[in-house]
Amino acid sequence: MSRVAKAPVAIPAGVEVKLNGQEITVKGAKGELTRVLNDAVVIAQEENNLTFGPKEGAANAWAQAGTARALVNNMVVGVTEGFTKKLTLKGVGYRAAIKGNAVGLTLGFSHPVEHELPAGIKAECPSQTEIIITGCDKQLVGQVAADIRSYRQPEPYKGKGVRYADENVRTKEAKKK
């Protein structure tokens, strides 16, 4: 039985929630998000709270209800506060710059890398070695950050590459003669 599903999701002022069967739409100051939830989940809206529960007879209904509650809570937080991921570039000549709706990266390849940003995602570069990605969809913000990081992951000997700001890269010792 999911303990996560038992806690209701509070709907703050300024956030509008629409239920249409299993489709839920959350609209707030930072944007609008829509998601279709699993059929094994029952959603009920009571004043300023959303409650989740299992549908009778479904095998993994409590697990699905907990997942649905976490996803909807992230939607509510996203449209009110938004989500942020910070990336740092470490390495000689590694640079980042915003070019329209894309992030231009110089990562030691023979060519510059252009990463196109999807709709609803914003990026900024406070310095040449920092990228801050913001948006209201937690999954999409994390995916864009992971895609940018995948161009040049931190290598284990010197730690050069693109890393999350809070990431701790374990370095190996070089081979001795």
From Swiss-Prot:
Keywords: Ribonucleoprotein, Ribosomal protein, RNA-binding, rRNA-binding
Database matches in Gene3D superfamilies: Ribosomal protein L6, alpha-beta domain
Domain of life where this protein originates: Bacteria
One GO BP: cytoplasmic translation
Pfam families: Ribosomal_L6
InterPro entries referenced in this protein's UniProt entry, alphabetically: Ribosomal_uL6-like, Ribosomal_uL6-like_a/b-dom_sf, Ribosomal_uL6_a/b-dom, Ribosomal_uL6_bac-type, Ribosomal_uL6_CS
Molecular function GO terms recorded: rRNA binding; structural constituent of ribosome
CC per GO annotation: cytosolic large ribosomal subunit
Function: This protein binds to the 23S rRNA, and is important in its secondary structure. It is located near the subunit interface in the base of the L7/L12 stalk, and near the tRNA binding site of the peptidyltransferase center.
Family that this chain belongs to: Belongs to the universal ribosomal protein uL6 family.
Subunit comment: Part of the 50S ribosomal subunit.
Protein name: Large ribosomal subunit protein uL6
Native source organism of the sequence: Vibrio campbellii (strain ATCC BAA-1116)
Gene: rplF
